[in-house]
Structure formats: structure tokens, C-alpha cells
């Protein structure tokens, strides 16, 4: 059954913690440094975190590592997104298929997933995984969770990814399942699940009052680096309008609600923080 396939794939993959640790070891390894000389394959500065303006880092009670930052399929992301994609994606999926099994239509089952994603006291960004442990509702995490949900659905059914309907990753072969022809190590099948929604600079978190001021200062101090990172193909800095449009686009997953949180005019977007003195009269 589709549920059995999804559970088998989930069980075959390392859990979120070990997956993140594996990636950390890889991107920080000497082998990666030799393969990409002159490049920082994974950037991490655990001694100057985004919360060091506080006398005590509140994440110390919950966080056991500081995830590196790296680029995958042209998207900047933190290593924690891998754990969100697999673990939380599977949680979303089980909620979805359980709702279907209870007789709910697909739209109702999807609504149940979003309710869990945005309001569960433990596993939502509004609860322990977000505001309580980090002082933030991470829209990047929400997007990775949702992409993982789409991945588990796409194992056995067509799913819209990046606005295009994609065929299943596995197909029936008599009584068994086998990988579809497009699922091969040398194809881009997995790139369809990774998007700029995972980039917490382009798709910022909604910070609580304790964190917001320090985060805004940290972003502003890094304005030159941020604008250089997102420069265009001619190495020119992009205009404010680019970041306005990008932030607006990333509020949904190509039109689908994935549980994005925060008012548009209150989020610490690049457009708002890195372009001081500009009146916001041309966009959200």
C-alpha cells in the first residue's frame, strides 16, 4: 500500500538528528575542503549566534548543535532542514493518510495537516519546535516540513511540485514497487523538492519580541554580505523590489498554503532591513 511504501522509506532513512549530524560531518570534513578548495562548503559560527545579544542563549535548553549553512540546488539552507523534511514530512503524511482512512476527502485531510502544522503544541512552529525553543516561528522550517509531506505523497501518487505535476517516484511492478525511470542518481528528481522557501534570509521567521531587536541588528550589520550573496548573474546587487517580490512569492508554496506565519509588514525581510530610509509604499 502507499502507506507501507512511505513507512518503509522513512524507516530506511536516518532520523532527523542523525541525518543532520551526518551532513555536518560531511560539509565540515577535510575531504570536502579538498574537493572545493577556497570555498566554505558549510558555514557555521557557533560562537556568534543570532541570539548572543542576550545574557543567556535560550536555545541552550533545547538545541544540541548549531547547523551549518550551505547551498543545495541553488538554494541556501541550514542543515536542520534535512531533519524537518524527513521527520516532520512523515508526520504530516501520517496525519494525511489517517484522515483519509477516517473517511475525509483529500481537501479535508490536507486541512487537518495544516492545522497540525500551525497549532500543535509540540510539533508546530507555534509550539515547542518554534517559539518556545527558538523564539521564532520558522517559515523555512514550515516549508521544509511541507516539502517532506509532498515527498512522501509523491512516492506513490502524482504531486504538484514547483507548480508542475510530477509523476510518482515509485510505480507498481506486479505485486511489488520499483523506482520510476526518472529516479536515478544522475537525474534532478530531488531538486524538485528543494526551493528558496527553505532559505531563511529570503523567507524569514516571525520572531517574538525578545528576539526581534537583536535579529534586526544582526541582519543590518551584514547588509553588504547579504546583498553580495544574492547578487545577479552580472555580479550586481539586486534592487529592493526583487526582495519584495521574493518575500511575497514565498508566503505560499506556488499558491498552496504551507503554514506560513507572520504579518508581511512585520517580518524582517531583506527589503525592509537592508534598504534603510526607503518608505514601504510599493509592496507588502
Predicted regions and their residues:
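Intrinsically disordered, low-complexity, mixed-charge
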Residues: 1-119, 129-142, 146-284
